[in-house]
């Protein structure tokens, strides 16, 4: 990311794998002007994700994700389950977007009603295990407070470090 920040005059927004304040601070330290967080918001009731999808994000299985074109015909990441595995076995038979999306959506309706999470397209990023069930306003408030806390720790460390004698360089 530092190379991109140095090479462009536009704001750089970090995305992918950022699900908590530590990831946000790391992105800012590397020069990002902002961050885009996705999966961490899916477990919030306000997300519009189905109850089964939100529950799946809070399980151990959420830590095992894989890439697939099977959900929509376009590359996406999801929680590994029977549906994802079966679709990936038939990768050469996957329809182009939006046909594949329509097909999977049609199959998802009865799976959702039957609470068959193993047959649902469970979109999730690599940091899905960091998801927690919170109201979105609580999640945002916590993120702001935690970023401030981490930033304060970094500033204190920097002040301590700069007050120590530095070795001579030749």
Predicted regions and their residues:
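Conserved active-site-proximal phosphate/metal-binding subdomains
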Residues: 1-13, 18-170
